[in-house]
Amino acid sequence: MKEIWLLAESESWDEAKEMLKDAIEIGFDGALVRRDFLERAEKLGRMKIVPIEDAVVKISSAEDQERALQREVVVLKFEDWKVIPLENIVAMKKSGKVIAAVDTIEDAKLALTTLERGADGIAVSGDRETLRKFYEVVKEEGERVELVRARVKEIRPLGVGERVCIDTVTLMTPGEGMLVGNQASFMFLVASESEESEYVASRPFRVNAGSVNAYLKVGDKTRYLAELKAGDEVEVVKFDGAVRKSYVGRVKIERRPLILIRAEVDGVEGSVILQNAETIKLVAPDGKHVSVAELKPGDEILVWLGKKARHFGVEVDEFIVER
């Protein structure tokens, strides 16, 4: 997910403190402060605090670009905002984070999207309203995933097994859910319980995600559903590919009847095992929810396709087959 950091360069602790308090309340991911303010800044709230001197690199020459590539987390500050140096660093930096210091909304949008991938985040300063506007830009731009249409091939009731319910700290809307699957490279958009039902009230914070063995997509990694616990980061995915970050509030693992759903995209097959109940739904290409009780072969649903194999949830270049 894209990050937003506060760049508190003020030599006045009172000014820096006010910006820090605003950034913490708005929900910033981190802050950069003068080294002599570090101890006081860390007492204001739980947020990543980094000394400006350790992270900020001013870019005005090719040599500066080389220095930036050596930092694990680098905040790029351009003497005169230019796209090409940022593109160079984004393209060449293979690990760590690239954060771009920006002054305007236009520069923020450009930094977050350059070379399609964009910087990992932006660093900004200003009053509370300015900080909030930058925050909204970052969350709107956000991450996106490419969802494709898959055709259902098989629907088969199974016996009883353990399934995982993920209760998040976020209220989801119809068309949103999480990417879950038996294969790390083929994941189904499992709908949130954001629709009313004649049987139960809606639970818009919940995704009844699937069997304990299933993978959950979280950024560039995967997690086993059975491993999740309160406080873990998860991703809420919308039918149009928009992604937003959330956190687990509670996980419930219970024994329930299960059903296997198998689907196919251009000859590539994948499957997911869900609870066999009418309130469990997948998401169709138009964003509507489709109950597993009504799903039939030939129906189209949304899935995500990956490319690489994974080792402990991380993408690796190796041969692996999952069925």
From Swiss-Prot:
Single GO MF descriptor: NAD binding
Signal peptide limits: none
Enzyme class: oxidoreductase
GO biological process: amino acid biosynthetic process; aromatic amino acid family biosynthetic process
Record's catalysed reaction(s): 2-amino-2,3,7-trideoxy-D-lyxo-hept-6-ulosonate + NAD(+) + H2O = 3-dehydroquinate + NH4(+) + NADH + H(+)
Alphabetical keyword list: Amino-acid biosynthesis, Aromatic amino acid biosynthesis, NAD, Oxidoreductase
InterPro entries: DHQ_synth (IPR002812)
Membrane-crossing residue ranges in chain numbering: none
E.C. designation(s): 1.4.1.24
Domain of life, source organism: Archaea
UniProt family annotation: Belongs to the archaeal-type DHQ synthase family.
HAMAP family, sorted: Arch_DHQ_synthase (MF_01244)
Biological role stated in the UniProt entry: Catalyzes the oxidative deamination and cyclization of 2-amino-3,7-dideoxy-D-threo-hept-6-ulosonic acid (ADH) to yield 3-dehydroquinate (DHQ), which is fed into the canonical shikimic pathway of aromatic amino acid biosynthesis.
Protein known as: 3-dehydroquinate synthase
Gene source species: Archaeoglobus fulgidus (strain ATCC 49558 / DSM 4304 / JCM 9628 / NBRC 100126 / VC-16)
Gene name of this polypeptide: aroB'
